[in-house]
C-alpha cells in the first residue's frame, strides 16, 4: 500500500495538532497553584508611613462612632412647666395684700405710659436709678416673708433695658408670655416675671421683668386680653453671684423679645440701646465689683 502526498500531509497535521494540545496541557498543569505577578521593587523598598501596613494587613478594627451631644429636655422651658409653676404659686388671700403688691411693683417699672385719648408721648423711663433702689425696699416689705427666699440687700445700682413695641396695639399677652417663657422667665413675687438660675424657676434670681405701664404688673388670669406698650428688664447690684453672666442672659432675653415681637431696645436714658451702651453697662458691673472688693478689705 503506497502512501501518497495527501496522506502524508494529513498525518503531519495530526501530529502537529497533537503536539500543540500536549504542550498546552503541560503548561496548564505546571502553572496550577502559582500566582504569577511582577513585584515593583521601587515600592517594596519604601519605609512604612504612619502604620499604613498595619492598617492594610492587620485585623479589622472597630472605630468609635461620633455621637452628637444630646440636649436634656429638662433644661428646655415649656408651657407645661410654666403651668405647673403657676399652679404652685400662692394666690392672694385678701384684696388689700394684692393692692400692696401692686403698688410696690408699680414703682419698679421703668416709667409710665400715658395711653389716654390725648395720644401724648409716653414716659417709659424713671428719672433715676435711686427710684429702683427705693422700690426694692418697699417691695421687700410689702411682699409676704418666706423662709425659702433669701433676703437681699438694697440695690445700689440698677441696670435697665426696656423693650418698646413698634406696633400701636403693643405686645399681646399670649405672644409675650410665650416669648419670655422660652427665655426662662417665670411668674413670681410682686406679680412680675423673674429669671432664676434654672430654666425651671429654681435658684437665685438673676434679673426681673416688669410691665412698663401702670400698675406695672401682669395678670395671668386675663393674659388672653392683656397687652402692653413696653416692658422693662432690670438687674440690681448687689444681686446675683455672677452679675456679668446674668447681665448677658438679660440682654439675650431682651433682644429675643424685640426681634420676635417687633420691639425697640432702649436704655435707662431713653436712648436706643447700642453695643457701646451694653459695654458701658458691663463696665459699671466691673466697677461695682471692684468697689465691693475694696470695701471688704
UniProtKB/Swiss-Prot annotation:
It is found in: Cell inner membrane. Residues 23-297 are cytoplasmic. One of its GO terms (cellular component) is cell division site. Residues 136-149 have a biased composition (Polar residues). Residues 48-150 are annotated as: Disordered. The keyword Cell division applies. Residues 124-133 have a biased composition (Acidic residues). Residues 1 are periplasmic. Its main location: membrane. InterPro entries: Cell_div_ZipA, ZipA_FtsZ-bd_C, ZipA_FtsZ-bd_C_sf. It is a single-pass type I membrane protein. Keywords: Cell cycle, Cell division, Cell inner membrane, Cell membrane, Membrane, Transmembrane, Transmembrane helix. Residues 83-92 have a biased composition (Basic and acidic residues). Coiled coil: none annotated. It holds the Pfam family ZipA_C. GO terms for biological process: division septum assembly; FtsZ-dependent cytokinesis. The chain crosses the membrane at residues 2-22. Belongs to the ZipA family. NCBIfam families: septum_zipA. Interacts with FtsZ via their C-terminal domains. Essential cell division protein that stabilizes the FtsZ protofilaments by cross-linking them and that serves as a cytoplasmic membrane anchor for the Z ring. Also required for the recruitment to the septal ring of downstream cell division proteins. This is Cell division protein ZipA. It comes from Pseudomonas putida (strain ATCC 700007 / DSM 6899 / JCM 31910 / BCRC 17059 / LMG 24140 / F1). The gene is zipA.
